[in-house]
């Protein structure tokens, strides 16, 4: 883009097109103006040269007051999403009011207003943290703006689209304007690996990838790991878990498994012929260390909470298989969070009936990090997700494999 086609605004380092200048002048409404003001401020902070188009977005806003402010600011200003923009979960208000009758009215009101704001903005009301599985699926090489810490690395690494680690507000702003600043992971040289991770640990299942993600995130913090030594191609759920848990202990917006993920077939390609900043080895000992670190209790439990990130159809099938012919112990509540899409299919396949018949609950549209779970504040819980344990701040946390969670729910305790 040449300077002659752009307008440089006073006090800004970015070049903006004439249409972008008109948006900032308020010609397209106050809501769109506020959205672009935020994006320009971000671009200015990161020395972005210009804005680039995005084809879709995912906003991780939730039913909390900080998110409500920005959603209503745009919606009340008449903004509409210009590109498909999906939404993170809030919570199923009628369902939780029925279960926990004393949810504070002000909390429910905030959630209702957030959801209404998205409706007015014309967003996709998916209420799911795994939109890339059904409701909002990017293609390889597509430029997008995704928030949700587990979605960003999945979109960059597994799908091979391009997104920065967006905030809920910046992703929503990009969805409204249809653009994002050109910086960070939208630039090829910034997508090169930073750390070489040599994996010799045995990776048998989803939970091993949970531990791997947790350990790698903690060791690296912020960076782009390149993992070698993984011979078998991870399945979707294993990759989701790796993405999610590497962002509990760290901030991993992208990773490579050369030959397995889509963007680099060799280690050299992943590092763009540069050398790694550091090398990390992951053996069974490191995974055991990560597992031990996540345990703070044993014995009697009050509840089991699964689905952070939202469970897939395959995972719901696994839960149903483990619960078939069994009953949840009296006094223990058993919850599985999932997307509306996955629940519909699970109902058709009979999985929801089995889970509910055993005394469990399958809830949609709901995030672990929401006020609706207040009743569990001082109780002892178990989950298969370190992210869930982190968000809920269990009085005492037990983290284990799915089969261990189901066994504890049936027995009423973890042994």
Residue positions per predicted region:
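Intrinsic disorder/low-complexity segments
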Residues: 1-10
